[in-house]
Amino acid sequence: MLAAAPSAKPNRALLFGVFGTLFFLTLLLGAQTPPYNDGRQIIDPAENLIYRGSFGIPLAGGSVFYNPRPMFVSLVHVPSVLLRRGLSALFPAADSVIRTLTFHLVPAAILGLTGMLMIRFLLLIGVGVLAASLSTSALAFSTILFVYGRVVWSDILQAAMFWGFFSELVLAAREPGRGGAIKVGVWAGLLINTKYTFVLALPGAALFLALEAWPRLRARGLAALFAWTAVAFLPFVLFILWSNHHRWSDAFSAGYGGVPFQESLFWGLYSLLFSYGKGLFIYNPVLALAMHNHRLPNRYWLAIALVCLPIVLLYAKASDWAGDWSWGPRYLIFIVPVLMVPVAVRLNTWIEKRRYFLVGLFGVLAMTGVGVQLVGAGAYWDHFIRLSQATAFEWLGNPNRAGNYSNKHGAHCDPCYEDLHNHTYTPAFQPIEGNYWLLKHWFKGDRWEACEKDMPWRRYTSLPLASPKAFCSTIEVDWWFMPFRKNYRTAGRILLGFFIIALAGCLRLWVRGCRTCGGKGLAVASPGP
């Protein structure tokens, strides 16, 4: 495994500085879009719990809707709902903008937590503080974590909990003991409370821990290690059973319908990694460096194979591998922090050996990723997806959905190939290029005639398509300050100034923490027997 350099000690100033910097910068660049689709299903139960005392959403006719997702993904938003309730009581006329702002607090905080966990782990395994800081910054702002840190979806929570679990697993395997086992159990419990699919990670995690700890603990010590892990894990399982029974009157019912798994495993995996509209490396270019790392001992890759690969293969087999309406491969967001570690190790080697050209390569890929995420954050992804569907139907015809795998035969079907293949598989409707095209003309203030000339699909057809016109005229930058410019300009400026000052203070704390924590070197221990 990787061994920590003696001087690499993450301190409180560094950790809080990282958290605060990522939190306030994400808020500064935060969205104005209220929760839609999955976001509504996550935030509505939290709102209903605070305002009406019930987790269920009342529907017409007296029925009640329960979100089939684990209850935990909604409960984490309770603090923001409480804050909104308090502020709206003081300023009732501003409830709409208060609601938008407060609902984005928790995702931004979770992104900050992920970065804090990342830099802590990197320092503990011996990565130098400069490489650790640069890699943590890249994780937060040059990968899809940034886009999902701005919206009320559960994906950023999944990424944070998976990284917390995976990193503690690796640390516990390096130095097995009661404390590490308890941490692994707690993180495992939190993880499966974000998405039940992550249960697939647990057998591989147990096997990895057993393989690593066996030479030192043998049977009795290993049994004690797993016992402590189980004790910490059990309360979270009981919470799931209770929440299922509360919602469905059946502790073992998750409330989900059937999900088809009909995709070719090869093409599903290929599409998750390399497809035009959902490829992991298109949306996270800096992760390409993870695939070229040879200094990382095999045990880390063994952990990835045992813990992460079963989940990736399941998603590859799913007919809905693309994740519906979303930015990039959201089903793979959980593995993004995991793959950033080899990138950090590689970067640290380049810095130590003063290979500035290769350090520059990291910078180019990271800044390219920043550009990708800014394009994705600049306009809410639904806008271009709706545009691409309307344009494709006008250009290529309305598809025949009679044979699709859903029960929506003949109607619009979000997860179906007929409706989503255009922006998933074809370069004509690639979302990064599409969002860039929309934002470019919005910033220029162009009329439709100018927008029409360089539409991405103009490379393939000269037809005068009318569908995009309405979408181009309604595009607006997805930034929280935009509505404040119209009605609450003074309040908006005060908030803007507060975010900037808080960001500067946290950034200074980060720098001070770097100066005091040391840890310039990278120590690689023997990979073990």
Tell me the role of every PLM-derived stretch:
Residues 1-529:
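Membrane-proximal envelope and lipid/glycan-remodeling enzymes
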